[in-house]
A protein has these predicted regions:
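Small, basic N-terminal interaction modules of short regulatory proteins
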Residues: 1-95
C-alpha cells in the first residue's frame, strides 16, 4: 500500500496494488473515487478533502478489498492523525 497526499490539491490517493491495471473508476460520493481492476478488486482510492468523513465502510462493503488492506485503511481513516495528513510525499505502509 502506498499513500500520497497532494497538499496543493487537497487530495489523498491510496494505491493498494502498484502496477495493477485499472479497468474502471467508480464515484462513491462527491469526493471519493475507487479504481477497480477487471475482477472488481480495489486498486486505488482517491479522496478529495480527506479531512472530512469519507465512505470507507461503503467501499469495504461494495468492493473486494483484502483483509490486510481493509485493516490498514481503517487505521488510516481513524488513527490519531486522521484528518491532518501532514505528509506531502509518499508514505509507504507495509502490511
Amino acid at each position: 500500500m502506498k499513500v500520497q497526499y497532494d497538499q496543493a490539491a487537497g487530495v489523498l490517493y491510496i494505491t493498494l496494488a502498484e502496477g495493477a491495471q485499472v479497468s474502471r473508476t467508480v464515484q462513491v460520493d462527491a469526493g471519493t473515487l475507487v479504481d477497480l481492476d477487471r475482477f472488481g478488486s480495489v486498486r486505488g482510492i482517491e479522496v478529495i478533502r480527506p479531512g472530512r468523513t469519507w465512505p470507507l465502510d461503503e467501499i469495504l462493503s461494495r468492493f473486494s478489498v483484502a483483509d490486510a488492506d481493509a485493516h490498514l485503511l481503517r487505521e488510516l481513516q481513524s488513527g490519531p492523525d486522521s484528518g491532518r495528513y501532514a505528509f506531502a510525499g509518499p508514505l509507504h505502509v507495509v502490511a
